[in-house]
Structures are given as C-alpha cells and as structure tokens.
C-alpha cells in the first residue's frame, strides 16, 4: 500500500497523508453481506456515556466477515475483489466459492484478484489458506488465529499483524504474538497462512482534528483542566497537578485492570517486552 503525502496548501493539509488504495478493486460492497450499523455515540441503553471520546462520524455499513471458515473445508474459492472496510484497518477480500456462496475474509498481504484459495486439513501452505495449527509447519507466518477451537479468529486481525508459529508441544502450539509475547494455543485451533495486508496504514498522518471527527473520534480533554463537577482532578486556583493519584472521571484508580489470577495466564510462556523490562 502506497502513501500519498499532500502539499502544504492549507494548515490542515500540511503533514497529512492518505492511502492510495492501490490494492482496492471495487468501491461498493456486496449487498448480501452488509448490515446496518446504528451509531451509539458511546452511550448505553440508559443514555449514559460508557465509552468516552465517541460520537459523530461518517455513516457506515457493517461487512459480515467469516472468521471461522470451518464449514467450507475442501471447497475452493476464487478471490473476486479486494475491498475497503471502514470498520477495520485491514482490507477485506470477497470470495466466490464454487458452490455459489459469497463471503468476506480479512485480506492477507500478497492476495491477488483471481487467486484460488481453500480451507481444511488438506489445504496447501500458501497465503490465504486456512487450516488447523497441527497441519501448519513450524516457522510459518500466520494471522487470524483462534483462541478456542471453532470460536472464530481472535488474534492478529488488524492491518500488518502477524504471528509466528514457533513449534508444537503435545496438544498445544507455541506462538510468538505481535507484542513479542510467547503463548500456547490449542493445536486444534485454526489459522490463516500469511500476514494481514495494508501494513502501511500505521504511517498515515491524519493532519487535522476534523479527519478524526469523520472517523467518529471526539476530543480527549485532561481532567486537570476541567471543573470539579466534571472530574476528580478538576478545579483549583491556577495550574494544578490534580492533587491526588490519577483516577478516572468516576474515581477509579489508574492502572492495570486485568485479573492477575486469570485462568489463561498459564498459557503464557514468556511475557511481552515492555519499556520497563527493556535493557537500557
């Protein structure tokens, strides 16, 4: 994916860039595979804000993506189109199966229009094919990996993401995640060969706040500049530090929220590297 940089004709254009969409072969989605996507604005059924910084944005239709592919084993499919999906960073591929059905999948890097792909234990190890981890050789780059057999892909689905299959031990496969974490996954789980395409998406410079509003992202305001009625850090004469340990607008302390005793922690072989753990 190529990135086009704008000339600084206006302050909003300066430093901004946009995708060239060279891989896209069709601009309108398959009508049978889209559903309405009503906007919530970050509110729940009571109208209370449960997720901040959401609201507005361009209208979207949700594309139904096949994250399982287990009911199409042994049925070849032709890549009809590579399409843009506003609901995710990766592009999507429209498949035409030989039995007449059409489905969307996440488009991996190198997948071409007209290419034939398939899924199942007898599928070849080539980009776009989906098969169980037990049938994939060690060292293969994969994406769209399941955490539980038959539950659908949960790992490595965003643009440019990939996982390396390091090896197999008993009933588990050992994976190196995009975060550098090494963890075990049931060997019956399925994965797609290759890495997710559209890797240059991370290099796009939005350039102005308005482009984020088009995406449905509202401004983020620090608590220390609010009034006391709006945030525990608000108020005070002049510029203050908040006067207490960092908390959310509802008083919950800042910090990690994952349960340290979560049942799946025993599947982690090696923790991901963080800034604190890196050698200086």
UniProtKB/Swiss-Prot annotation:
GO: which molecular function terms? rRNA binding; structural constituent of ribosome; transferase activity
**Basic and acidic residues biased stretches:** 23-33
Concerning InterPro entries, the annotation shows: NA-bd_OB-fold, Rib_uL2_dom2, Ribosomal_uL2, Ribosomal_uL2_bac/org-type, Ribosomal_uL2_C, Ribosomal_uL2_CS, Ribosomal_uL2_dom3, Ribosomal_uL2_RNA-bd_dom
On subunit structure and binding partners, the annotation says: Part of the 50S ribosomal subunit. Forms a bridge to the 30S subunit in the 70S ribosome.
The uppermost taxa in this organism's lineage are: Bacteria, Bacillati, Actinomycetota, Actinomycetes, Mycobacteriales
Residues annotated as region Disordered? 1-47, 224-280
Q: Which family does it belong to?
A: Belongs to the universal ribosomal protein uL2 family.
- Residue ranges with Polar residues bias: 258-268
* Entry's transmembrane regions: none
Q: Name one Pfam family in it.
A: Ribosomal_L2
**Listed Basic residues bias regions:** 37-47, 270-280
Q: Which UniProt keywords apply?
A: Ribonucleoprotein, Ribosomal protein, RNA-binding, rRNA-binding
- Protein name from the UniProt record: Large ribosomal subunit protein uL2
């Amino acid at each position: 994916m190529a990135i086009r940089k704008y000339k600084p004709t206006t302050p909003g254009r300066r430093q901004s860039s946009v995708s060239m969409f060279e891989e896209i072969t069709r601009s309108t989605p398959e009508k049978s595979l889209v559903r309405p996507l009503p906007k919530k604005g970050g509110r729940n059924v009571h109208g209370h804000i449960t997720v901040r910084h959401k609201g507005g944005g361009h209208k979207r239709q949700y594309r139904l993506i096949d994250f399982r592919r287990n009911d199409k084993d042994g049925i070849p499919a032709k890549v009809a189109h590579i399409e843009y999906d506003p609901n995710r960073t990766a592009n999507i591929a429209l498949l035409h199966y030989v039995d007449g059905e059409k489905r969307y999948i996440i488009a991996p890097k190198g997948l071409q229009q007209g290419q034939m792909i398939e899924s199942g234990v007898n599928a070849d190890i080539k980009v776009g094919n989906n098969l169980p981890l037990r049938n994939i050789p060690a060292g293969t780059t994969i994406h769209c990996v399941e955490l539980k057999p038959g539950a659908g892909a949960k790992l490595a689905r965003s643009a440019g993401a990939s996982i390396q299959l390091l090896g197999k031990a008993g009933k588990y496969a050992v994976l190196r995640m995009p975060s550098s974490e090494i963890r075990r996954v049931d060997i019956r789980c399925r994965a797609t060969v290759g890495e997710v395409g559209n890797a240059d998406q991370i290099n796009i410079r939005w350039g102005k706040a308005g482009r984020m509003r088009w995406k449905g992202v509202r401004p983020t305001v620090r608590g220390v500049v609010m009034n006391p009625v709006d945030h525990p850090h608000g108020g005070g004469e002049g510029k203050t530090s908040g006067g207490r340990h960092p908390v959310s607008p509802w008083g919950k302390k800042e910090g990690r929220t994952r349960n340290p005793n979560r049942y799946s922690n025993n599947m982690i072989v090696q923790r991901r590297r963080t800034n604190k753990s890196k050698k200086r």
